[in-house]
Amino acid sequence: MTIMITTGNSFEGKVIKQYLGIVRGIVVRSPTISQGLMGGLKSIVGGKIGAYSQMCEHAREEAFQLMIEHAQALNANGIIAMRYDTGEIGQAGTEVLCYGTAVII
């Protein structure tokens, strides 16, 4: 089933028939030893930390997919007000949360 997703509060030209509640996907990731070493070196000399960027992008995509699976479990065909949030888990990890409101349109 295809789910329409928007960061807005509605879908243009569509009527929301039912609000099903909040759906979310949460992923916690920590860098590998090699990513940590490379990140540490990059932080000293400056520049983009590619390994960390890639890790964060994969975590965002995984959290997004988990949110979609949560919505599908509720038989939703739309998600409105989709957002990302991140936080640190100690010094070892990063949490990525993707959330929104599941709806039937």
Curated annotation (Swiss-Prot):
Q: Name one Pfam family in it.
A: YbjQ_1
Q: Which residues cross the membrane?
A: none
Origin organism is Legionella pneumophila (strain Lens)
Top-level taxon in the UniProt lineage = Bacteria
**What family does this chain come from, according to its entry?**
Belongs to the UPF0145 family.
What is the protein's name according to its record? UPF0145 protein lpl0253
